[in-house]
Design a protein with these regions (language model features):
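Substrate/ligand-engaging "lid" and interaction regions
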Residues: 1-504
Length: 504
């Protein structure tokens, strides 16, 4: 079977949207599955729906997999994207051939870094996008030189690119770029800007350039939200897809249907970017923080809020939980009655986001294991659920039923018939009889192992008064200790599903 390229695609009779020739308007540091299923998908739609007429040049931020660039280039930038999942309760399996990518360069081989610098000098270039992992936005003094080919770190590479552009256009204020950071760290754009300033100072670059870098360019922090499995794991399913497509695709990509990109930027940026006109789920806002809070407290908080009890009740994957009226009902009550009222965004927007969460959890193509979500649940409950829990008590002057039960379920999960403390976990036994391994910070596992012979009352008191766990003594919250103990005893005696049902 022939490998995908424009000629092969044409011969298959593909009749979807394709853009073969257009100027490169976007430099993208990162060629991985996530950006290609997310950012490049949005640019592809913008080409079709908004007449953007722009290509994206991919730059590999590290040089450990140059073969990926070869594969992308063999396919002339084309690749097949499947967006699969559930939307408004309906199964979705949508295919699109993405044609917004021009090519991919590995700047560590041959003269490819020169190609990157040449693009920096282009009149057509408007935007830089990056996803270089959480470790990518980092500054270490002396790790990168100005004339290195290429500089080591991503921020050093970007500083060099910006300097090249500054020189090419004599510091023209209207030649700055929009820089969209997608790395999963807080304030990603601000952190990137800070790193670039450090490199500029290390390299003794002129003050005029530093001023241009900071004022002519727009460094944006962004929040990304789309689950990207990235590939088809079943060889038979993959073979059937390629047979149906009529070509072999070396860089085929898979993402969930849901996707939202929130960009923090100044007034007017929305009109500079092509996404609003394209009608895609990309928004420009003055502050990304409320949207980050929305994601953490609703999406992540839902996961951490119900999975531990659900696992004790005998469930193994998220989708099966959504098919159970009690567990789904518990999650929805927790979201709509206890979490959403504490968030500082439009209620309709929050309700829609929460409804989409149920669809995402019900994805028929993803077997998301509860045990994988359970990793580090102590810090997760504190970060994702505790703020909603405390805000609800502050506002309503009473305990939130579901979140209190969720806290009891967390304690139950970490103390269910403890068997042993191993080097990398705590072995517990499920009510059904099988053992499971809890993975968390060593101090948290040591704590539960040390309390394995406690009565439930002793254990609840020890957990709630653990300052290392919660940064405060939770027994000072009126009625909480008694409520958590009652919930824990209900889970132990009647099972977690019955305990969840008692909250409905």
């Amino acid at each position: 079977m022939e490998t995908l390229n424009y000629k092969v695609l044409s011969e298959t009779g593909y009749n979807g949207y394709i853009l073969k020739d257009a100027p490169v308007k976007v430099m993208q540091f990162g060629e991985g599955n996530f950006l290609r299923a997310f950012v490049d998908y949005f640019y592809d739609i913008a080409n079709e729906k908004a007449g953007y007429n722009g290509k994206v040049k991919l730059v590999q931020p590290i040089g450990n997999f140059p073969q990926m660039a070869d594969w992308i280039n063999e396919q002339e930038g084309l690749y097949t994207l499947y967006l699969r999942g559930s939307e408004k309760g309906q199964k979705v399996d949508a295919k699109r051939v993405i044609s917004c990518v021009s090519d991919c360069v590995c700047p560590y081989i041959d003269d490819k870094w020169d190609e990157v610098l040449a693009l920096a000098r282009s009149e057509d270039l408007e935007t830089v996008v990056s996803n270089t992992t959480e470790a990518g936005i980092a500054y270490t003094q002396g790790d990168s030189e100005f004339d290195q080919v290429p500089p080591n770190s991503f921020p050093a590479k970007l500083t060099r690119v910006l300097y090249e552009r500054y020189k090419a256009f004599n510091g023209a204020a209207d030649k700055g770029l929009v820089i969209l950071s997608c790395e999963l760290i807080d304030n990603n754009g601000k952190e990137l800007k800070k790193c670039c300033n450090n490199y500029a100072k290390d390299w003794n670059l002129e003050a005029e350039f530093i001023d241009w870098m900071n004022n002519a360019n727009t460094f944006c922090s962004t929040l990304v939200d789309r689950i990207v499995p990235g590939r088809i794991r079943d060889p038979k399913e993959l073979a059937a897809m390629e047979e149906a497509n009529g070509y072999h695709d070396q860089v085929l990509d898979v993402g969930e249907v849901f996707g939202v990109w929130v960009i923090e930027g100044p007034a007017g940026l929305e009109d500079k970017l092509p996404f609003k006109k394209a009608g895609v789920n990309v928004m420009v806002v003055p502050d990304v923080t409320p949207y980050k809070k929305r994601k953490v407290r609703i999406l992540n908080g839902a996961h951490t809020g119900f999975v531990l009890g659900a696992y004790l009740a005998g469930f193994d994957i998220v989708r099966d939980c959504m098919h159970n009226d009690t567990v789904r009902g518990f999650m929805n009550k927790m979201l709509h009655e206890e979490i959403i009222p504490t968030l500082p965004l439009d209620k309709k927007d929050l309700e829609e986001f929460a409804s989409a969460v149920e669809d995402r959890f019900n994805n028929p193509f993803v077997n998301h294991e509860l045990m994988s979500i359970s990793l580090n649940s102590t810090s997760k409950w504190k970060a994702r659920n505790m703020p909603s829990f405390l805000a609800y008590i502050e506002e309503q002057k009473q305990l939130p039923k579901c979140l209190t039960m969720s806290l009891a379920a967390y304690i139950a999960f970490y103390s269910s018939d403890i068997q042993e403390r191993t080097a990398d976990g705590l072995i517990c036994k499920r009510p059904a009889g099988n053992t499971y391994k809890i993975q968390d910070d060593a101090w948290a596992l040591d704590f539960y192992y040390a309390h394995k012979d406690d009565t439930d009352a002793q254990l609840v008191h020890a957990v709630l008064t653990n300052i290392q766990m919660w940064d405060q003594d939770l027994t000072k919250i009126e009625g909480l200790e008694a409520a958590v103990l009652a919930d824990l005893e209900l889970i132990r005696t009647q099972g977690a599903e019955a305990a969840y049902k008692s909250c409905l």
